[in-house]
């Protein structure tokens, strides 16, 4: 039975999270749909675009019988921890919660979230980009709706590429990328960094996703881990090991470190494969390279293909503890599929809704925000490239129901391959064994191939 799974709560000593639980829904597990037009909702999330006040005011105006109390958790990690505590306690969860996409499965599998197909969300599938939509399914049912997305992109420094005699626009396949890496290394720069820390986990999942890998499969109580024999994983392992062996990547500098920003700013790192939300981070982290960076579609494993993958993204869900589920879903749909989605996009959130991605306003180079970004990217229409990527097809990809552990364990084990202690294949074998052990501790039947 699914309720045999352990819900691991974080230490209750974290005062801010205890406070959040106190501000959660006072309802117990006898949740029901409630009145769709009259409710007092509690909503946990973060507000990176500073748009929440406007969105919720507009929602309440359109739904005069519903009020929303927004508790700003500050970060995705704090939100997940607080929700874990509330589920473990059996009370205190909000009506609506914002989550990072990879964590949705862990809460769905423990019955912490509502299957949104009960409210017709499954009929919205074609309205969203495939990548973010596919990530939020559990047992082929939507347990959250995407509020933003992060299609994986190829960002490159044209000045560094030009110095190496490489045309960035000519890189269509990963073999092209490998050949470019050799030329760039000869100039003293690296084509990119790969350090294998926990900060590199999301790019790792995006890269294996695009390679068609299925390193783990979750089927109810059963988890199958196939970390090194899976065809897509072998494709990825052999390619990355070649980059490591030939010293073509900076294997010491982790993403988001001070050294990482310094190397992006001085040209040591010539490119990144990372989510579409990256432009603002380059603009602030590598100001000296203004005018030099460009963005292109992700290189492909097979020539002529147009397969994408997701790196990051967040979503809105309705909790099982809520007794206002119908009204809560109204808010979720408004923010992800209704007018609130446009407001989010207007304030800098990268959209997941196709109609916004295809809109003239999103790619209009004359808007203040777009002009600033395009100037940094040498006059390129950045959103036009990003929009095309978001609408590319993606393979289906699952996350483990204990994804936070998977991220930490990835850094513990895989970093050893980048430091040269062991091969990447051996590191991933060790990683698979740790994932299996954790799954068994949580009550799953785990098979390692």
Region roles according to the model:
Residues 278-289, 302-408, 446-448:
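C-terminal lobe and pocket-closing loops
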Residues 1-41, 61, 426, 433-449:
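Short, low-complexity disordered leader/linker segments with a strong preference
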Residues 93-95, 124-160, 304-309, 392-400:
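A structural signal for short loop-to-beta-strand junctions that line the ligand-binding cleft
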Residues 181, 222-253, 298:
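Glycine-centered hinge/linker elements that transmit conformational signals in sensory
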Residues 35-47, 66-71, 95-96, 143, ...:
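Short, well-ordered beta-strand elements
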Residues 58-128, 163-165, 263, 267-271, ...:
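Extracytoplasmic "Venus flytrap"/periplasmic binding protein-like
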Residues 162, 386-449:
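Conserved C-terminal helix/tail region of periplasmic/extracytoplasmic solute-binding proteins
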Residues 101-152, 178, 207-208, 294-296, ...:
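Hinge/lid segment of periplasmic solute-binding proteins
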């Amino acid at each position: 039975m699914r309720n045999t799974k352990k819900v691991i709560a974080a230490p209750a000593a974290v005062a801010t999270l205890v406070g959040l639980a106190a501000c959660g829904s006072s309802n117990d597990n006898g949740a029901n749909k409630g009145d769709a037009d009259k409710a007092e909702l509690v909503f946990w999330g973060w507000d990176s675009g500073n748009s929440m006040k406007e969105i919720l005011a507009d929602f309440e105006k359109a739904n005069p019988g519903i009020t929303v109390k927004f508790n700003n958790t500050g970060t995705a990690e704090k939100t997940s921890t607080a929700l874990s505590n509330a589920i473990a306690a059996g009370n205190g969860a909000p009506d609506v919660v914002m989550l990072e996409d990879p964590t949705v499965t862990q809460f769905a599998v423990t019955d912490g979230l509502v299957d949104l197909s009960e409210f017709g969300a499954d009929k919205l599938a074609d309205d969203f980009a495939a990548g973010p939509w596919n990530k939020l399914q559990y047992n082929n049912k939507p347990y959250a709706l995407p509020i933003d997305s992060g299609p994986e992109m190829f960002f490159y420094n044209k000045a560094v590429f030009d110095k190496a005699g490489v045309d960035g626009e000519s890189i269509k396949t990963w073999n092209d990328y490998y050949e470019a890496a050799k030329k760039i290394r000869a100039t003293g720069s690296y084509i990119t960094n790969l350090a294998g820390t926990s900060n590199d986990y999301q790019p790792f999942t995006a890269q294996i996703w695009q390679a068609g890998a299925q390193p783990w499969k979750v089927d109810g109580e059963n988890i199958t881990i196939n970390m090194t024999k899976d065809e897509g994983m072998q494709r990825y392992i052999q390619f990355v090991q070649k980059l490591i062996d030939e010293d073509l990547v900076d294997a010491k500098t982790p993403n988001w470190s001070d050294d990482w920003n310094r190397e992006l700013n001085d040209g040591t790192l010539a490119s990144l494969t990372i989510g579409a939300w990256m432009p603002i981070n380059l603009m602030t982290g590598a100001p000296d390279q203004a005018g030099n960076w460009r963005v292109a579609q992700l290189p492909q494993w097979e020539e002529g293909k147009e397969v994408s993958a997701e790196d990051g993204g967040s979503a809105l869900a309705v909790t099982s503890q809520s007794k206002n589920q119908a009204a809560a879903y109204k808010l979720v749909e408004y923010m992800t599929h209704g007018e609130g989605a446009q407001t989010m996009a207007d304030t800098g959130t990268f959209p997941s809704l196709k109609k916004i991605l295809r809109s003239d306003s999103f790619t209009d180079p004359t808007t203040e925000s777009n002009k600033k970004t395009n100037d940094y990217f040498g006059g390129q229409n950045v959103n036009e490239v990003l929009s095309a990527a978001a609408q590319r097809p993606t393979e289906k990809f699952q996350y483990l129901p204990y994804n936070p552990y998977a991220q930490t364990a990835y850094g513990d084990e895989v970093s050893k391959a980048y430091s040269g202690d062991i091969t990447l294949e051996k590191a991933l074998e060790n990683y698979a064994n740790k994932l299996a052990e954790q799954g068994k501790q949580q009550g799953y039947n785990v098979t390692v191939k």
